[in-house]
């Protein structure tokens, strides 16, 4: 039996990954992390979506220690989430240092327990928002280290790594989940489901990607299939 673990926030990217995993694996588990995030409404959204999309199990892990260690606008109410700035330089204040290091490591430990062959994460280098822990070289390096540390061959899969947001919408549509992803996921840094607040960087990327896909469906779908190898 093929098993996978999805790092699952209930947002656009991880929900698209879950929709795909349900077609590619016999059994899919979801792991969601409670780190005291500003947008912690995503935890309830993730619970609902994991059930709706047929996950075999859904674990919510308490990692609130990360909130104490990592200073970010997503972990401190006193630090405002900035509006989207198209030409902003540097790492944004929404970056949570160590988040993906912790999430992927814990997901791999869970995968070891349930005998899963893969950990799936929705990180993306094309639209990575300046986050260093969304880069392909980071994921591959951590995967190598985790496998050495556990003497186990668990793959870190990144199905969205080389596609952009419009193509991610196309992928959701390919698996028949465009409306669900649009209406029921939570991507917004301010914790608003669906189309979100419309001002933060996460909402901007999501909206621009959706608009581009809806305006150029055939071309974007073709590009997505070419990059992912889907038919």
UniProtKB/Swiss-Prot annotation:
Binds 1 zinc ion per subunit. It holds the Pfam family QueC. GO terms for molecular function: ATP binding; ligase activity, forming carbon-nitrogen bonds; zinc ion binding. It comes from the Bacteria. Its cofactor is Zn(2+). Its EC number is 6.3.4.20. ATP binds at residues 8-18. Zn(2+) binds at residues 188, 197, 200, 203. One of its GO terms (biological process) is queuosine biosynthetic process. Pathway: Purine metabolism; 7-cyano-7-deazaguanine biosynthesis. InterPro entries: QueC, Rossmann-like_a/b/a_fold. Keywords: ATP-binding, Ligase, Metal-binding, Nucleotide-binding, Queuosine biosynthesis, Zinc. The keyword Nucleotide-binding applies. It catalyses: 7-carboxy-7-deazaguanine + NH4(+) + ATP = 7-cyano-7-deazaguanine + ADP + phosphate + H2O + H(+). Catalyzes the ATP-dependent conversion of 7-carboxy-7-deazaguanine (CDG) to 7-cyano-7-deazaguanine (preQ(0)). Belongs to the QueC family. This is 7-cyano-7-deazaguanine synthase. The lineage of its organism: Bacteria, Pseudomonadati, Pseudomonadota, Gammaproteobacteria, Enterobacterales.
